Every structure is written in structure tokens, then in C-alpha cells.
Curated annotation (Swiss-Prot):
Entry protein name: MFS siderochrome iron transporter 1
Positions glycosylated per UniProt: N29, N404
Spans through the membrane: 53-73, 90-110, 115-135, 146-166, 177-194, 211-231, 264-284, 291-311, 331-351, 354-374, 379-399, 407-427, 441-461, 522-542
The keyword Glycoprotein appears for this protein: yes
Domain of life: Eukaryota
GO cellular component: plasma membrane
Subcellular location field: Membrane
Description of what induces expression: Expression is induced during iron deprivation.
Function: Major facilitator transporter involved in siderophore transport.
GO molecular function, one term: transmembrane transporter activity
Family in the record: Belongs to the major facilitator superfamily.
Length: 560
């Protein structure tokens, strides 16, 4: 009999062994229980060596590093870019549309990686990101930037999702969160490097060069991953672990099949629903009659109607459900998704320093997460441990959101939130994957990500509404009489805000207005904390170490 490890060693030496155990091959890789994309990755895992496995880990780490660095750079630049178009107040609106679409699209991407393959999904998302970065680098107005940012964020979330799915394919459940957490450690570097890089581009060149440079870098680190995976898939075909079958469908039949399989109607309806319901909270301040404006009312009504149609479509009409409701009946999955959906929270600083404060919670999360992933067996109790840190960090921001508070104190609160987040992120992902088979890992990760995006978009909508409705009035009230006429211009232009020197009446008014609205945002965030506890309570208490000892590994082949 030819064992999987022997086959892997032989194939790595370009020797194609003769595989006689047809029954084993059929049960492992050609089972009807697995979709084509899952079969392909299980076949690849059966033929590669440990060296190739670790090389792939390293290359995926490089992809994550460049991607996280780009996120840090563009997040730091975003307020200044919207301000350059004199639309700084629309920052939340830009993020809401992007967050909703990216979250909803991951379920469609889950279908792509399961039906077509992991690499096909990764390559598609890479193409989306590159096109979006080119659009960002060449945009001439706010409308073009909104479109580019929406496309970019969809591609970014999709790429990270594909990396997570591939890491899940390459690991046992017991060791998965170690690799997930390690793959998130580039945040440690991007926290410090990202804002500084953004500052250098913004000060010495412009934001357009930043996006162009990162488009080239992202392609450079992604291509080796694609080449290795395609090469190993070819090896698995030669070894007999994978049999490629033709669908037998015509071109039109293939288009129809994929439109149904990816439930395009469902994704359009749910994206439209959340976008139309949440966007008015951020843009109502620009409407002529506020909430009484016709198009604001129409957006809310159409959004609710789209939501109702989506539920009816998914329940009674959709041949393939966009949102697999059967998974939402599992308390561990729904609890983890709700937890991820509940999580949210800079002072007028330089670009670099503001970025450090903004990213400090991600930094502490990245440092602690690998250790938590290593020791987490009963993940439910580990998640409980994150609640005090999250509550303390968020609550302390209420008194600390004052102009005279040191930046160090604000940063400490973000570190505390990051510690809590590290528990939640590690344990939450582990929770959703612990109760499904390899076949369903991509889908439950997509659902988990969708809930996070919806929660983030709700948070952005609330924050955007408070920002756009409270800040202008506070700014007007605090500005000296001779500057009140410029209140609207100051509100929309961040560079103009920073041009006023410390100690001037205008600068004091701006800082005071920011502190007031941010303090109210933090109070709203603290009110969400009871939902965190409730979300964890309903999890099943699964010990994943004992589970794998009793039931065997979730994945197969030469894995970590």
C-alpha cells in the first residue's frame, strides 16, 4: 500500500508513484460529500512535503504582511483624502458601503472557493484589489474615490478570507488558531510602519503614489503562492489523487449554473437593504430638509422592502440559499457571529501619531493572539477572559476623551481593548469551525465575516450619524465670532483644521468639539458590552483537543 506521506515525498522529487489503492483515493478525494474546490485542496495536501507546506505558510505570511501594511497606510490616509475633496464628513459613508458589500460578498466567495477552487478565489480577489488601487491612484473626485474604496475593501476582505480558508485547509483544528494568530502578527510591524509610510507619501509625494506602489508589491508577493498551489495541484493529478472532470455544460448553461449557485439575486438584495437603511444616518446632515427629505425617506423604505424581499427569496424561492440558515440554528455559530458583530470604537495629531493611537489595539491583539491560540482548548472560558479587558478599555475612554488627557492614556485604553479583542477573535473563529466538517469551513468563516462586517457597518452608521449631526453644531458653538462663518469649511477640511496652531481659539474650538462627539460615541460603545457576554453564553463548551483525539482530524493529508 502507498501511504500519503510516501506519495508526498515521491511527488516532491518529481516521481509519480503508482497508486493502486483506489478505494482509499476515492474515499479521501473523490467523495461526493466534497465539492470540487475542497477535493482539490485535499488532494494537494496529500502530495506536498513538509518543506512545501512551510514554504506556503511563509508566502501566505508575506501576503498578509503587505496587505496589512496597505490597510494601515490607506486607513491613515483616508481622512486626508476625503478632506482633499472637501468631503471629510463623508468618511463614514465611504466606509459603510465598502464594509457592507465586502461582508456580504464573502458568502459568494465561499461558493467560489468551494466550487472553483481556493486559488481561483484568491486570484479573483487579487485582481479586484489591483484594479481598485489603480482607480484610487487616478481618481479625480469623491464619487470615483468612493467606488474605488468600495472595490478595494471588497477585494481586501476577500483576499484575507481566502488566506484564512487556505490556512484552515493546511492545519488541524487544534493547531489552526496558532497559525491564524501568527499570520496576524504583521500587524505589529504595520502599526508602526504604516502611519510613517503614509506620512512620507503624503508629505513628499502624494497619496496616489502610495496606492500605485502597493499594487505592484501585492502582485509580487501573491504570484508565488498561486504558482506553488497550481504546481502542486498538477502533481496531485499525476499522482492520481485528483481526477479532473468536465461539467458537460454549454457556455450559457455554465453562466446560468453559476448565477444560481452564487445566488446573485440574494447578494444584491441584502447589500442594497443594509446600504439603504444605514447610509441615511451619515448623509442626512447634507439633505435639504434632514429626515423629511424625500430621497432619505425613500432610501429607508426601499431598504426595508429589499430586506423583506431577501428573506422571502431565501426562504421560498432561491434554488441555492445565499445565507445557509441551517448554520444559524447552531448556538455556537450564531453566538460567535453575534460576538464578532458587536465589536467597535484619534485626537488632532500628526498623521503618524494618529495612526499609532488608532492601531494600538490591533498591535496588542496581534502580540497576544498566538499565545492564546496555543493554549486554547476550552475556547468558551478563554473568551470570557477577554470581557474585563474590553469593558475596562472602552469604559476608561469616557473620562479620557478630554482635550487635556495625555495621548499615552488614550493609547493604554486601546491596548486594553486589543487584549480583549485578541481573546474574542481567536476564540470566535475557533468556535464556528469546531462544530462543522472540512466541507463547511469556508461557509461558516464567510458567515462569521459577514456578521462582523454588518456589525461594523452598524457601528459606522451610528458613529457617522453622531459625527455629522453633533460635530458641526459643536464646532459652530465653540468657534470665535470672527470664524463662525467658516464652520462648515473647517468641518469638511482636515488640513485646514490642522493649520491652526495650538493655543489659538480656533484650534481649541476644534479640539473641544472633537472631544465632545467622541465621548458620546464611546458611551454608545459601552452600552453594547452586555451583548458581548450574551453572545458567549450560548456557545457550546467544546474542548477541541479532546474532540480531535476522539473524532480524528477535520482536514487530511500532510498538514500542520
Amino acid at each position: 500500500m502507498v501511504t500519503l506521506s510516501n506519495v508526498g515525498a515521491d511527488v516532491e522529487k518529481n516521481i509519480v508513484p503508482e497508486v493502486n489503492d483506489a478505494s482509499k483515493r476515492d474515499s479521501d478525494n473523490a467523495s461526493a460529500d466534497f465539492q470540487p474546490g475542497v477535493k482539490r485542496v485535499r488532494a494537494v495536501a496529500s502530495v506536498w512535503s513538509k518543506k512545501t507546506l512551510w514554504l506556503t505558510f511563509a508566502l501566505l505570511y508575506l501576503v498578509a504582511f503587505v496587505d496589512m501594511l496597505l490597510v494601515s497606510v490607506q486607513s491613515t490616509l483616508n481622512p486626508f483624502i476625503t478632506s482633499s475633496f472637501e468631503k471629510h464628513g463623508l468618511l463614514a459613508s465611504v466606509s459603510i458601503v465598502a464594509t457592507i458589500l465586502s461582508g456580504c460578498s464573502t458568502l459568494t466567495l465561499a461558493k467560489i472557493v468551494d466550487v472553483w477552487g481556493r486559488i481561483e478565489g484568491f486570484l479573483f480577489m487579487l485582481l479586484v484589489v489591483v484594479v481598485a488601487l489603480i482607480m484610487k491612484a487616478t481618481c479625480k473626485n469623491m464619487e470615483a474615490y468612493v467606488a474605488a474604496h468600495t472595490l478595494y475593501w471588497t477585494g481586501h476582505i476577500g483576499m484575507i478570507y481566502c488566506v484564512d480558508v487556505m490556512l484552515a485547509d493546511m492545519t488541524t483544528l487544534r493547531n489552526r488558531m496558532i497559525m491564524f494568530s501568527i499570520n496576524n502578527t504583521p500587524t505589529i510591524a504595520s502599526t508602526f510602519a504604516g502611519p510613517k509610510i503614509a506620512d512620507l507619501f503624503f508629505s513628499n509625494l502624494n497619496f496616489r503614489w502610495a496606492f500605485g506602489a502597493f499594487a505592484i508589491m501585492l502582485v509580487g508577493v501573491s504570484l508565488p503562492v498561486i504558482v506553488i498551489m497550481l504546481f502542486m495541484e498538477r502533481k496531485s493529478v499525476k499522482a492520481g489523487f485528483l481526477v479532473k472532470e468536465k461539467s458537460g455544460r454549454s457556455a450559457w448553461e455554465s453562466i446560468k449554473y453559476h448565477l444560481i449557485e452564487f445566488d446573485v439575486v440574494g447578494i444584491v438584495l441584502i447589500t442594497a437593504s443594509f446600504a439603504l437603511i444605514l447610509l441615511p444616518f451619515s448623509i442626512v446632515v447634507y439633505a435639504p430638509k434632514g429626515w423629511a427629505t424625500g430621497y432619505i425617506i425613500a432610501m429607508e423604505v426601499v431598504g426595508v422592502v429589499c430586506g423583506a424581499i431577501f428573506l422571502a427569496w431565501e426562504r421560498f424561492l432561491a434554488p441555492v440559499q445565499f445565507l445557509p440558515f441551517k448554520y444559524l440554528k447552531n448556538p455556537t455559530i450564531i453566538g460567535s457571529c453575534l460576538l464578532y458583530g458587536v465589536m467597535f470604537a484619534s485626537a488632532l495629531l500628526t498623521i503618524t501619531t494618529a495612526g499609532y493611537v488608532l492601531n494600538s489595539f490591533s498591535l496588542s491583539s496581534a502580540i497576544l493572539a498566538p499565545g492564546i491560540g496555543l493554549y486554547t482548548g476550552n475556547f468558551k472560558w478563554a473568551a470570557y477572559a477577554g470581557i474585563p479587558f474590553m469593558l475596562l478599555g472602552t469604559a476608561l475612554l469616557i473620562p479620557f476623551r478630554q482635550p487635556n488627557t495625555s495621548i499615552g492614556a488614550v493609547t493604554i485604553t486601546q491596548v486594553l481593548v486589543g487584549i480583549g479583542t485578541s481573546f474574542f477573535s481567536v476564540c470566535g473563529q475557533l468556535a464556528v469551525m469546531s462544530v462543522v466538517s472540512h466541507q463547511e469551513v469556508a461557509v461558516v468563516l464567510a458567515i462569521w465575516g459577514m456578521f462582523g462586517s454588518i456589525g461594523a457597518s452598524v457601528g459606522l452608521a451610528v458613529a457617522g450619524a453622531m459625527w455629522n449631526n453633533i460635530l458641526p453644531s459643536q464646532l459652530y458653538r465653540r468657534l470665535p465670532e470672527e470664524s463662525k462663518a467658516m464652520a462648515a469649511q473647517i468641518f469638511g477640511d482636515m488640513q485646514l483644521q490642522m493649520s491652526y496652531l495650538d493655543g489659538t481659539p480656533e484650534r481649541d474650538a476644534i479640539v473641544g468639539a472633537y472631544a465632545d462627539v467622541q465621548r458620546k460615541m464611546v458611551i454608545a460603545g459601552v452600552c453594547m458590552m452586555p451583548l458581548v457576554m450574551a453572545s458567549i453564553v450560548i456557545w457550546r463548551n467544546v474542548n477541541i483537543k479532546k474532540q480531535e483525539e476522539e473524532e480524528g482530524s477535520q482536514t487530511t493529508g500532510n498538514i500542520f
